[in-house]
Curated annotation (Swiss-Prot):
The modification Phosphothreonine is found at residue 119. One of its GO terms (cellular component) is mitochondrial outer membrane. This is Non-selective voltage-gated ion channel VDAC2. The keyword Acetylation applies. The chain crosses the membrane at residues 38-47, 51-59, 66-76, 81-88, 92-101, 107-116, 123-132, 135-142, 149-157, 162-170, 175-187, 190-197, 201-210, 214-223, 230-239, 243-250, 254-263, 266-275, 285-294. The record marks 85 as: Involved in ceramide and phosphatidylcholine binding. It is found in: Mitochondrion outer membrane; Membrane. The lineage of its organism: Eukaryota, Metazoa, Chordata, Craniata, Vertebrata. NAD(+) binds at residues 254-256, 272-276. GO terms for biological process: binding of sperm to zona pellucida; mitochondrial outer membrane permeabilization; mitochondrial transmembrane transport; monoatomic anion transport; negative regulation of intrinsic apoptotic signaling pathway; negative regulation of protein polymerization; phospholipid translocation. The gene is Vdac2. Belongs to the eukaryotic mitochondrial porin family.
Length: 295
């Protein structure tokens, strides 16, 4: 008698995001596609040997200040290693070495150092991250002559529900300098995020994918001891595979609009504008232009 093989339906593995990425879908609708007051150029390319080069330059239209960064990255996939070199126009040099999934599955260790030749200032950081089903942990140590600072975070997820905690312990002061909580819920097209920072700042956001081409987001924040409540609504609509428009408005009557167009594969143009609705005739509005090149 032939054996009957019955396929086993495995439940998909759900790894929660790191604490910094909680509520990211809602924040992206507010932040991406806008660049008020800046003229920006980003260039990304990759050599035949696998070295990735990233260059970014921007000019602030208000102050006229020009800044730029250069980054090179090489991945040694066989050993799970990534080497990154960074430089910026403040003449700060950075080196980062990361190893992932080698010591154990889901563990990533990063060694990050920076050095400023002008001031002689040096800094070092060791980062660790561990992610498995239903859990995402992180612990970073900032080294300082006064004493290291320890940053820790943990996010737990179960059937769409997320709960996280983030802290910073300053060994020089021997006390917690940051203590944040977050609770959220997410599905394929809906995300809810709430957070409390240091017991004084309260925030929440909602992300909703209304349809395939239309995304919306709502953001609310309040600080205890003040009457200041911040509220905003944002939306993004994909006109076609190469173009999208974004818009947002907050309770301060600041209205932002953005238009992104892929001119050709690897070339993307973004135009944006910020209008102050309270003083429309007084000026002070901002424009932005960004060009991204990738090859």
């Amino acid at each position: 008698m032939a054996e009957c093989c019955v396929p086993v339906c495995q439940r998909p593995i759900c790894i929660p995001p790191p604490y910094a990425d909680l509520g990211k879908a809602a924040r992206d609708i507010f932040n991406k596609g806008f660049g008020f007051g800046l003229v920006k150029l980003d260039v990304k390319t990759k050599s035949c040997s696998g070295v990735e080069f990233s260059t970014s330059g921007s000019s602030n239209t208000d102050t006229g200040k020009v800044s730029g960064t250069l980054e090179t990255k090489y991945k040694w996939c066989e050993y799970g290693l990534t080497f990154t070199e960074k430089w910026n126009t403040d003449n700060t040099l950075g080196t980062e070495i990361a190893i992932e999934d080698q010591i154990c599955q889901g563990l990533k260790l990063t060694f990050d150092t920076t050095f400023s030749p002008n001031t002689g200032k040096k800094s070092g950081k060791i980062k660790s991250a561990y992610k498995r089903e239903c859990i995402n942990l992180g612990c970073d140590v900032d080294f300082d002559f006064a004493g290291p600072a320890i940053h820790g975070s943990a996010v737990f997820g179960y059937e769409g529900w997320l709960a996280g905690y983030q802290m910073t312990f300053d060994s020089a002061k021997s006390k917690l300098t940051r203590s944040n909580f977050a609770v959220g819920y997410r599905t394929g097209d809906f995300q809810l995020h709430t957070n409390v920072n240091n017991g004084t700042e309260f925030g929440g956001s909602i992300y909703q994918k209304v349809c395939e081409d239309f995304d919306t987001s709502v953001n609310l924040a309040w600080t205890s001891g003040t009457n200041c409540t911040r509220f905003g609504i944002a939306a993004k609509y994909q006109l076609d595979p190469t173009a999208s428009i974004s818009a947002k408005v907050n309770n301060s009557s600041l209205i932002g609009v953005g238009y992104t167009q892929t001119l050709r594969p690897g070339v993307k143009l973004t135009l944006s504008a910020l209008v102050d609705g309270k003083s429309f005739n007084a000026g002070g509005h901002k424009l932005g232009l960004a060009l991204e090149l990738e090859a």
